[in-house]
C-alpha cells in the first residue's frame, strides 16, 4: 500500500499551526472535538490506480477528508479562515478539492463545521499528481 498520509497530515497541520493559534489537530474522523477550534483529517480512500508489470503498486488514488470545527462568537468566520489555510496547503501539495459542505442550519448547532474532501494520485516515491 502506498501510504503518505502522515506526510500530508503533517504538512497541513504545520501550515494551520503557523497561521492560527491554539488550533487542535486530530488525525482521525471525529463527530465532535474536545477543544475548539479543531482540524480533523483522515484518509477515506486509498486504492492502487496503476500497477507495474510485477504487480507492484506504482500509483494510488487517494482521498483525504478534512473537517474544521469552530464554536463561539465569529465561529463561521474563524472556521472559514482556518479552512482557507487548509485549502491553500492542499492546493500546494497538488490535492484537488472535490467536495465542500457546512453544518446544516437545521441542526441549530453551537458548533460550525466545514467538511471537505481532497483527491490526488500518489506515486510510490511520494510524488503527488492532480487527477
PLM region spans:
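Residue-level recognition of well-ordered beta-strand positions that form the cores
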Residues: 42, 65-69, 117-121
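Secondary-structure transition/hinge residues
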Residues: 20, 74, 94, 126-128
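Short, charged interaction patches at domain edges and termini
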Residues: 1-11, 32, 46-61, 96-131
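Short secondary-structure junctions
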Residues: 22-27, 94-102
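Small/polar-rich, solvent-exposed N-terminal microdomains that initiate assembly or binding
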Residues: 1-52, 74-75, 81-82
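Compositionally biased, intrinsically disordered low-complexity segments
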Residues: 19, 85, 89, 114-117
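Mid-chain, well-packed structural core segment of small domains
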Residues: 65-91
